């Protein structure tokens, strides 16, 4: 499987956490990725220089005004080239084989979208909560949506059917 995955990272404030998020996307075992960081903080002008990670797969977009995370994601989707869109918040990290395993699952099961389990750590790295992906039907998903956006991969063509997939 060599389909391009576009990783959309909206950013507002913490450069240190953003660098870690970018590196967790760049260090995936699945290498055919583009990472699009949408800088939603107009007071930070040269985010690429602050991040200081040189990689041809990394692209920065600067919002002229604060749009919020949702509209920043839409902007990233619109500038993406991948068949798949993956979301990664600027304070989240992925395990190294996250994209590979999830894409293989999607291919095997003919899915257009999927999400995974995840856990939450506190500032000292202790796991404080675990969220497990469950097989859910549409009704149960609507009633109790506990999907971490940073676990989602979806085909771009599905997202493009929605005019603005992320409201603010």
State each model region's role.
Residues 7, 78, 136-168:
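Conserved nucleotide-sugar donor-binding catalytic segment
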Residues 63-80:
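Glycine-rich, basic loop-to-helix element that forms the pyrophosphate-binding segment
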Residues 17, 46-47, 73, 94-99, ...:
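Acidic donor-diphosphate engagement hotspot in glycosyltransferases and nucleotidyltransferases
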Residues 89-93, 117:
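The conserved acidic donor/metal-binding loop of glycosyltransferases
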Residues 85:
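Short aromatic/hydrophobic "clamp" motif used to bind/position activated sugar donors
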Residues 22-62:
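Acidic donor-binding segment of Leloir-type glycosyltransferases
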Residues 1-26:
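N-proximal low-complexity "stem/linker" segments adjacent to membrane-targeting elements
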Residues 97-128:
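Conserved donor NDP-sugar-binding/catalytic core segment of glycosyltransferases
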